[in-house]
Every structure is written in C-alpha cells, then in structure tokens.
Regions:
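C-terminal cap/linker of serine protease catalytic domains
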Residues: 200-226, 232, 294-298, 374-420
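Conserved catalytic-core segment of clan PA serine endopeptidases
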Residues: 118-142, 178-294
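Chymotrypsin/trypsin-fold serine protease catalytic domain
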Residues: 234-240, 280-352, 388-406
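Cleavable N-terminal signal peptides of Sec/SRP-targeted secreted and luminal proteins
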Residues: 3-21
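Catalytic histidine site
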Residues: 139-191, 337
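Extracellular/periplasmic catalytic domains that process cell-envelope and extracellular macromolecules
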Residues: 140-143, 157-159, 177-180, 252, ...
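Catalytic nucleophile loop of clan PA
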Residues: 157-158, 347-377
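N-terminal activation segment of mature serine protease catalytic domains
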Residues: 43, 50-56, 63-64, 72-155
C-alpha cells in the first residue's frame, strides 16, 4: 500500500510539471555560467586537531537570511580569506591552503536580498511528506544511489568517483573536528547476494538515460513494480547499518559497503573565529575516499534563481535518524532565498543533514533533462530573526565561487573548472 501511495504521488508530481506548457520549458534550462578562478597560493602545516567535538546535527544561534541583511558585503580580500581551506588527512595531520580569487567582479557574492517571504516552521509536523525508498531496484540505482551515509550520523552525496559532498558541521563544529572524524567512513548502498557477492542480475540500470525520481519514477515499467510488490514482505525491508562490509546474512537485501575517508576539506569561512555571523554560508565539506566507488555520481551546478526551477521545487534523499536504516526521499518548494541560502518546506529529521539538494533542468539545445546538485542541506537550524531564534530548514546554495572551490577540490586544479 505504501509503495502504491508513493507511485501515485510521484505520478501526480510528474503530471503537474508536464502541464506547465512547452513555452515555459524554455526557461527551465541549464545555462553555462562562467566561473571565477580560485588559485592556491601558500600551504601551511598545522598541528593535529584534538577531535574533542561531539557531532551536532541541529545548530543553534545561526545568522540566517534576515540577520545577514544587516551585514556589509564582503570584500574580495574577505572572500579569499573565507575560501581558503583546511585539509585534514586520515593520519590526523592537516594543512591550511591560502587562495586567490580571479575574474570575479566585486559585489556579486553574498548579496542577501530575501525573496519569497512566505514563512512557516518546518521540520516534521502534521502529515509527513517523506517517502522511504524500499524497492531495491530504485534505492541502488541513480539518482537515489548517489545518497550516502556518514559514520558521524549525517548524509552526503557522490560528486565524483572518489568524492562526497556533505555539510561541514557533520565533521567539524566550527572550533574542532568531531570525535569520529579521524576514522570517518562513508556507507554506499549495494545489493549483496547470500554469499556477499556481486549485484544480483535482476538489478540493472535503466538504458538510454537517467532513471527515476519524483519527475520520472512513475515511468518505470509495470512489470518491475508488479515483481517488486510480489517479492516485498509485509514488513519493510531493513537496511543493515552494521560497521564494515556486510557478508553472509544479507540475503540479497541492500546493505552498506563502508569506505574509509582519505581526507576532509572545509572552507575557512565555516570556522567561527573567521566568520561568526556568516559561517552557515560555508556549511559544506568534501570528503575524498580511500578507494573509488563504481556508482554513477551526480554533477554540480551553480544554483539558479528559484523562479527558474520547475515549480520552485527541489529534491533530496538522505538517511533520516527517525527512520533508521531507510533511504528517505522528499521533494518540496522553496519558501525564501538569498544569494547563499534558501529555506525550504521539505520534511526532514537529523541524519539527513549533508544531503545533496538537486533539481532537474533541460540540457541546452537538447530535449534531454539532467539532474544536478545546486545546494547542500544544512539541516533544521535555529536562526536569528528580529533578535529572536526561530527554526527553519536551511540549505546552502552552490554559488559560482563555491562551485569553483569544490571543483578545485575534486580535480586538484582549476583548469577543469572554468564553466559550471
């Protein structure tokens, strides 16, 4: 019954998008943006961190959109300071890399002009609009398979064969690294046979394009859904969250394959001594894995304005704390935006922090639609509004400068990061 309900809602979402008309589709296109260059200058060796911080999946005292309106626009020197970054390696050593920003006109970043002022509190309340993806075909195939679980309790998303994007607060509290960051692991869902072998033959990727989510999940063949319903037991299948690579007793069910993290990179803007009021804008980090995965990853894109997103809608999947072992998908509308943040109406719970938020737009001059990551889900935050603390679900947008920085972390140079 739950699976039928999900299919109905996803079908309704698809039809609502298709009903907007072809003329409007012309606005829903990925545009090629010229990206500023971030050039590394000096590298300094730092002493090893203490790893004393406790993981904190909900932040308090955040300076959000309203609070940031009162702040001056950062200068180019400020931005270079914020975008300098720290790298922490698996052996506990760390470095600070200073950067220079080139080809970036002043005054184009961190302009916090709020839009879409309709506001309401949102974590999980009333009717829960989240969907647990229990079908093995869907949860281990793109785009759902890009969602990963961190051993620190957060979520993340695959952005290259060896890199994961997540929230900075999942590994660092702004003062020190969390206590399990030194031995941080990333869990990727895979289907294991009874012998712990390879993917079952029946679990194949779709041919000739991207598989399903809310916009296209309903297009899956009836045969696959019928088989799924027949095979599913009365109780939802549980995903084992035990440490290490699971063997033997998995019985063909999805389970996590855990991979150690080789290094963690965090912008200096996240550290409290650098940007006390604007640290939320830099709540993102990239994890480099010790070994590459074989899953399809999702590309990054500069976040467009909300009006250029179909239905002002965003999507993301993660591993919510209140649904232990389940991959949880949701889609919702954005309520308010600035150049660096947006508030959204997605139901969520601690554990989903760090998820990659994506949208689906057309490729230029093509009929093909493609999903790309445009923000990182920071989580349910208590933000300052008119001198008081109010709670909202907050996402950190991928701006041109953040795109340039994350791209540099992935490729190790800025030659491959000129357009986004």
């Amino acid at each position: 019954m739950a699976q039928i309900r999900i299919m109905f809602i996803l079908s309704f979402t698809l039809m609502s998008n298709l009903g907007k008309g072809d003329d409007l589709y012309e606005d829903y296109t990925w545009h090629v943006n010229k990206i500023p260059r971030i050039v590394t200058s000096n590298v300094f060796h730092l002493k090893s961190p203490n790893f004393d911080a406790e993981p904190k999946l909900e932040l308090n005292g955040t300076c959000g959109i309203e609070c940031q309106k009162t702040l001056p626009t950062p200068s180019l020197t400020d931005l270079e300071h914020y975008l300098s970054y720290e790298t922490m390696f698996e052996n506990g050593t760390r470095t600070l890399t200073k950067v220079n920003v080139r080809h970036w006109p002043p005054g184009h970043e961190n302009i916090t002009v709020a839009k879409h002022s309709l506001r309401r509190k949102r974590q999980v309340y009333g009717t829960d609009s989240r969907f647990s993806i229990s079908d093995k075909h869907f949860m281990t195939n793109y785009p759902f398979s890009t969602a990963v679980k961190l051993s620190s309790g957060c979520s993340g998303i695959l952005i290259s064969p060896k890199h994961v994007l997540t929230a900075a607060h999942c590994v660092h509290n702004g003062t020190d690294y969390v206590n399990n960051a030194k031995k941080l692991r990333v869990g990727i869902l895979k289907i294991r046979s009874k012998r712990g072998g390879k993917r079952r033959k029946g679990s194949k990727r779709n041919k000739g394009g991207e598989p399903e989510d809310a916009d296209s999940l309903s297009k899956g063949g009836k045969k696959q859904r019928r088989k799924s319903v027949q095979k599913r037991s009365a109780a939802e299948e549980k995903i084992s969250t035990e440490s290490g690579r699971e063997r033997g007793s998995s019985g063909g069910k999805p389970s996590f394959q855990w991979t150690r993290v080789k290094s963690i990179q965090i912008p200096k803007g996240w550290f409290k001594e650098v940007t006390e009021k604007m640290s939320i804008d830099y709540d993102y980090a990239v994890l480099e894995l010790k070994r590459p995965h074989k899953k399809k990853y999702m590309e990054l894109a500069v976040s467009p304005e909300v009006e250029k997103m179909p239905g002002s809608r965003v999507h993301f999947s993660g591993f919510d704390e209140d649904r232990l072992g389940q991959l949880v998908y949701r889609f919702c509308s954005i309520s308010e935006e600035s150049s660096d943040l947006f508030y959204q109406y997605c139901d969520a719970d601690p554990g989903s922090s760090g998820s990659g938020i994506y949208i689906r737009l057309k490729e230029p001059n093509k009929k093909k639609w493609r999903r790309k990551i445009v923000a990182i889900y920071s989580g349910h935050q208590w933000v300052e509004v008119n001198g008081e603390q109010q709670d909202y679900n907050v996402a950190v947008r991928i701006t041109p400068l953040k795109y340039a920085q994350i791209c540099l972390w992935i490729h190790g140079n800025n030659a491959d990061c000129t357009q986004g």
